[in-house]
């Protein structure tokens, strides 16, 4: 109830409180299975419906989901410096807590290695918050102009028809996208998301092989 909302008298949960914002879920597999599966409707439609015996309530829930998880219970599966203590069955069961349909609604999947001492103690300059803000504002401005005559406000809300309308790729890019998604046996939803990301990169020093690179963001060891 705390995540999606509920109670005897329905109240909005965290996903509705994060409407038009960012919802960060750490240790994703540790959430209850039914709570995770309840995320599928709002991630798809931007709202959540809660039904109780005497009342049905619908709350807005269009948010950006950012989730983090280990790949196994001990946390060291895939670590090049420390051995994993989990059995193959334990690893499979742990990763299986995140269903395929839920993973399919998460646009980008990235494995992040643990930061080492040399990286943490480095004096090399990092991108500042002001620079990141500038990039975000630039992206938002592009989307506002793109969707000024539509009933959506960002790329993530595009339908398949709108992806085809706004995300024009060249012949070579289309062929690479087709090859990548066929080899990876991706769903129609994943195809649209990769297509959208390819078009975005097309505006920033895009190369055809980027389609294959972006497709890899949809598929990791899960």
What positions do the PLM features span?
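Walker B catalytic acidic pair
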Residues: 20, 26-28, 38
